[in-house]
Amino acid sequence: MKFIKWSLVSVALCGLGLSAHAEVKIRSEVEDAYKWDFSLIYPSWDAWEADLAKVETIGDEIVALEGTLAEGPQQILKLEQLSDEIGKLAYRLYGYSGLQRDINLSDNDLLARWGQFMGAFQSMQQKLSWITPEMLSIPEATMMEWIDSTPELQIYRFPITETYRLQEHVLNAEGEKLLSYFSKMGTVPSGIYAAISTADAKPMPITLSDGENFEVTAGSYAMAMTTMRNQADRKLIQETLSQSIIDQKNTYAAIYDAALSSGWAEAQARNYESVLASQLDGDNVPMEVFTNLIETAKNAKETLRRYHHLRQKVLGLETYGWSDCMFPIVDDKTQYPFEDIKPRIISSVAPLGKAYQKELASLFENGQIDVYESVGKRTGAYSSGIYGIGPFVLLNYHDAMEDAFTLAHELGHSMHTQLSDANQPFATSDYTIFVAEVASTFNEKLFLGELLKEVTTPEQRIALLEHQIQDIIGTFITQTLFADFELKAHTLVESGETLTAERLTQIWRETTAEYYGDIIPADDPYMYSWARIPHFYNTPYYVYKYATCYASSSSIYKAIQTASSETEKAEIINRYLTLLSSGGNDFPIRQLQKAGVDLTKPEATENVVKELDRLVSELEAACAEL
């Protein structure tokens, strides 16, 4: 039974905050062509309220089925169809309230509407906690006979089969009801983390080397590390932000310990040997996928050393630390205006066929992209799909190279949603996070290829080469380092140890050295960064999927580029489009294998390390010509 895509809601709750850019327009000053059209979802709040009430009514119909599921296939069919109705409504209700909230985080009325939605569905989860235990009381062989003999049940075969696969980790009805009471308690650590790291965080004023006043926030820190060329200013900004963490390091450690302890308690209650085992089991991912990733990524240490030593040399820096790792080697001032980038992104996806290209182009015309920053708007970017309506993309576009790649990235997600929803019934339309980032990073690679065709200066080429390198470091190396740290921290909690700030900092320092060697000094403020990663507190063992997805998209892209014939290339592209159209109709590992990527073997991740080495060699050669 697919009830609601809670992963989508979780993503929407992560990383809320206001942008650090100055001179931001108010919402009314942004042209309508660059704003979401909410009438695509509902004509009014009255219509939204009516559907929210309808959810309660449908929920009561489902509750009335309690105790009747064993009567036959028609009862199962009724349950699944009613669940689909609630799920489809949930997407629309979430979209109308959540998306509007995200464009004005200071609007208390919108926050209240969002809370109304969340409250209704949390209550619904408790009322329907009996469903899985009752379904599992029916012998699996009987259920399969019912599905075989009832054509309308065929579309539910995979999700129902999944329920039986996981049955050893499902409690009886009373146990599931008891756990549902603690579901909100399990989110308390992440709520406290959001409060201390974002809601209660105050800007920290400093004076830069040129006398300019600067307010340090999480957002302005990220911007400064990638754009500010004065080393002393970057270091001051990093030290200022890090000091705010150091001052509360024991609080952050206590929150993280509570989050991990809560996850471990539920994993034990559900008969898992570890939190990692429980997280992998949800997608039926073999343990070797995780361990292969960690073992392989560490092999990039020497390449990372070469890259950062090159940066230090070209930039002429006597000392080198974390605050020197991210800003570009060359000061390329190329602008990427939104209107100029639109046709280039559309052109870049031509290899995927005219139908894909036309569908992507339509996303620019239908009020589905909220382009520019405005006062009160959530920072960052995402693509959020609403079944039956389509994807909605949030951006904070400022004409920078990173903004252009972010647009390509989010449109990759959006097209994944479009194709899955168009080709799958609601029950299997929801693709897993394990494959989600394949589509987004693949489209970034296509866009990069388009930009490389247009390079006119050595500086532009170096900027694009470095973008590729930083992309691999950020998406593959860093996320694997994060996952490695998580594994070590969870292992300590699961062995009975209480996490302290000193212990976490030690683990972070040791793990960083395993990937970066001596590039980052042991006393660098970066060593407290374990307190700054929201995913650690909100979604354990989430980040490794970024790395495996990157490896998967790289493997598919390379296969297309090196195909020996047009026929072979067409076959690879067709397998890839089939992956994008398959939603959640199979295990993600099997979906990727059908597309030509086997993550149970190390080849895909090893190829990323080789790609990084090749790019660093190209960058070394390009810099030698400056």
Q: Which ranges hold each PLM region?
A:
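Short pre-active-site segment immediately N-terminal to the catalytic Zn-binding motif
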Residues: 334-338, 386-408
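A well-structured
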Residues: 20-331, 342, 622-624
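Active-site recognition of the HExxH zinc-binding catalytic motif
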Residues: 271, 398-418, 440, 445, ...
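Post-HExxH zinc-binding segment in Zn-dependent metallohydrolases
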Residues: 430-460, 468-470, 474, 549
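C-terminal, non-catalytic "cap/extension" segments appended to globular domains
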Residues: 28-30, 39-43, 135-138, 158-170, ...
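Catalytic zinc-binding patch centered on the HExxH motif and its immediate surroundings
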Residues: 334-336, 369-389
